[in-house]
Structure formats: structure tokens, C-alpha cells
Amino acid sequence: MPRKKLVGTVVSNKMDKTVVVRVERTFAHPLYKKTVKRAKKYHAHDEDNSCGIGDIVEIEECRPLSKTKKFKVVRIVKKSVFGEEKLETPENVEMLGGEEK
């Protein structure tokens, strides 16, 4: 039986070597035929801690790695700029010892 492959968005990377991936699926309602969206969260193994919040990743089913972790990150499809900080913002300059008088 082939392994499931899913594509989703990383919503949390606070755990060590683990990310939470939100996978959305759409389907037609059986009675009303309206397109409905449903989402499910999966814990996935990220060996290098390389995923950030907002990244779009591909995950693949694997052997159980823990009680809730049964997927691993295969590749990062698209990196997000959501989590990046720029050091030039006024708040960061003040925290770094900023302005000379």
C-alpha cells in the first residue's frame, strides 16, 4: 500500500524536531452539492528544524515516531516570509543599544 502524501501549511514549530501542519481538503456536500472546506492538523517530524510558521510543506506517512507523530516532512514547497524579522525596525534598533547621542 502506498504511503499518503499531503501538502499543508505549518502552523506551529515550537516543539523540537516537530511541526504541526494544517491540511485543507475540499469536497462537495452529498445533499446540497455545495463545496465545503475541512481542515485537519497533523504532527510531522522535521529532522533539521528547518520549517517556519507559514511554510508550505509536503508530508509523507511513516512508521509511528511517537503517540501523535506519524508523518515526516519530505520537502518545503514554499518558504514563508511571515516569521522573518528585519533588524532595521525602530523597536529592534532601540533594543540593540540603538541611537547615539
Swiss-Prot record:
UniProt entry tagged with the keyword Ribosomal protein: yes
UniProt xrefs under InterPro entries: NA-bd_OB-fold, Ribosomal_uS17, Ribosomal_uS17_bact/chlr, Ribosomal_uS17_CS
Domain of life of the organism encoding this protein: Bacteria
Alphabetized PROSITE patterns for the sequence: RIBOSOMAL_S17 (PS00056)
This protein's GO CC annotations: cytosolic small ribosomal subunit
GO molecular function: rRNA binding; structural constituent of ribosome
KW Ribosomal protein (keyword) present: yes
Keywords for the protein's UniProt record, in alphabetical order: Ribonucleoprotein, Ribosomal protein, RNA-binding, rRNA-binding
Biological process, per Gene Ontology: translation
Family in the record: Belongs to the universal ribosomal protein uS17 family.
Subunit organization: Part of the 30S ribosomal subunit.
Function summary: One of the primary rRNA binding proteins, it binds specifically to the 5'-end of 16S ribosomal RNA.
The protein, known as: Small ribosomal subunit protein uS17
Organism classification: Bacteria, Thermotogati, Thermotogota, Thermotogae, Kosmotogales
Gene this chain is encoded by: rpsQ
